[in-house]
Curated annotation (Swiss-Prot):
Organism of origin: Lactobacillus johnsonii (strain CNCM I-12250 / La1 / NCC 533)
Signal peptide residue numbers: none
Protein name according to UniProt: Small ribosomal subunit biogenesis GTPase RsgA
CDD domains: S1_YloQ_GTPase, YjeQ_EngC
Pfam families: RsgA_GTPase, RsgA_N
Encoding gene, per UniProt annotation: rsgA
Length: 297
């Protein structure tokens, strides 16, 4: 029997739709996965045993890079992080929490500022100034949906999987629907084969976008940072990590240690004070195993 590698793009009631060479193949999982306590996830790269009679089986799950979200998506390369300018209000602290979480998961982030068109020009200018810092430390930032839609297909490499994240009400579903509508005009075959409805279930599917995929889910808004080791947190603030190479002590936690390059650059305005304050606040919460204030509301 022929074997082929592909990507799971949908999982419903024990059936797995796998994209192999731009075609969708419906499969079942062998019992061996249950015996190994392995569960195939949307996004998994898998080996499929193909049968001329249509009885196709998953026989191997290839090693995962990561898994994120609820329900989980495997092998996510990048996240499109939707941050609202207003309703809900823009929050640097929340932005830093998301960036920390995805750095921990080893996932790249592209920031999209939504609702900029209903924000006062004065407030928007302040937000744009704050986001310029994030661009300087390596995060792409978009605030124009049309420009994002033009650039996004070029940014998604072959077989990469992207998903969306952001707080509730930020506009993730609206953006996702726009992207999916555009994608269906280009690759209608796969979308039709899946026969998906609107976002009324907790199922996840992938739709083809550019050379890769976007997860068809409104994403997730809650993030859990408590599993990060407190002394490792500094490594997930990339600007702090870069500066720490010049700290006096190798294990500097950038709190009270003498000769701390991070604190020096904060005082000089070269590292955003808000970033440093986010680091200290998250570090204290992890240390105390304390729920952040924004989740108590």
């Amino acid at each position: 029997m022929k074997k082929a590698e592909g990507t799971i793009i949908s999982a419903i009631s024990g059936y797995y739709d796998v994209e192999i060479d731009n075609k969708v193949v419906r499969t079942r999982a062998r019992g061996v996965f249950r015996d190994r306590k392995q569960k195939p996830l949307v996004g998994d790269r898998v080996v499929v045993q193909l049968d001329d009679q249509g009885m196709n089986y998953l026989i191997e799950i290839l090693p995962r890079i990561n898994e994120i979200g609820r329900p989980a998506v495997a092998n996510v390369s990048r996240v499109l992080l939707v941050i609202s300018a207003v309703e809900p209000d823009f929050s640097l602290e929340l932005l830093d929490r998301y960036l920390t979480f995805f750095a921990w998961k080893n996932v790249g982030v592209v920031i999209y500022l939504s609702k900029s068109d209903i924000t006062s020009s004065e407030r928007l200018k302040d937000i744009q100034t704050e986001l310029e810092y994030y661009q300087r430390i390596g995060y792409p930032v978009f605030e124009d949906a049309e420009k994002l839609e033009n650039e996004l297909p070029k940014m998604i490499d072959k077989d990469q999987i992207w998903t969306l994240a952001g707080q509730s009400g930020a506009g993730k579903s609206t953006l996702l629907n726009q992207l999916e509508s555009e994608a269906k005009q280009v690759t209608g075959a796969i979308s039709t084969a899946l026969n998906r409805g609107k976002h009324t279930t907790r199922q996840v599917t992938l739709f083809k976008y550019g050379s890769g995929f976007i997860a068809d889910t409104p994403g997730f808004s809650a993030i859990d940072l408590f599993k990060i080791k407190v002394d490792d947190l500094r490594n997930y603030f990339y600007d702090l990590k870069e500066a720490s190479a010049n700290c006096k002590f190798r294990g500097c936690q950038h709190i009270k240690e003498p000769g701390c390059e991070v604190k020096k650059l904060v005082e000089e305005g070269k590292i955003a004070r808000s970033r440093y304050e986010s680091y200290l606040k998250i570090r204290q919460e992890i240390s105390d195993n304390r729920m952040p204030e924004y989740l108590k509301k």
